[in-house]
Amino acid sequence: MKKDIHPKAVPAKIIYQGKVVMETLSTRPEIHVDVWSGAHPFWTGEERFVDTEGRVDKFNKRFGDSYRKNRK
């Protein structure tokens, strides 16, 4: 086998919004992330109100009964 063909693993800091949130091993000393499980609503239990309508409601609001009448 060849020796020294793999990159060296060094302690790495995972950085989220300018703060170190975790440490691990990597080939890079710092890893900047946009999404982190510690701040995600699913993992924190935090509820966020999302103002979206369902597809059917959006369709009915847009076309109403006119779609059903023309379909006959």
Swiss-Prot record:
Family membership: Belongs to the bacterial ribosomal protein bL31 family. Type A subfamily.
Function, in words: Binds the 23S rRNA.
Keyword hit for Electron transport: no
Pfam families linked to this entry: Ribosomal_L31 (PF01197)
Quaternary structure annotation from Swiss-Prot or TrEMBL: Part of the 50S ribosomal subunit.
GO biological process: translation
Keyword terms of this UniProt record: Ribonucleoprotein, Ribosomal protein, RNA-binding, rRNA-binding
Recorded name of the encoding gene: rpmE
Family matches, as InterPro entries: Ribosomal_bL28/bL31-like_sf, Ribosomal_bL31, Ribosomal_bL31_A, Ribosomal_bL31_sf
Species of origin: Deinococcus geothermalis (strain DSM 11300 / CIP 105573 / AG-3a)
Name of the protein in its database record: Large ribosomal subunit protein bL31
GO cellular component terms given for this protein: ribonucleoprotein complex; ribosome
Gene3D superfamilies reported in the protein's UniProt record: Ribosomal protein L31
Molecular function terms from GO: rRNA binding; structural constituent of ribosome
Origin: domain of life: Bacteria
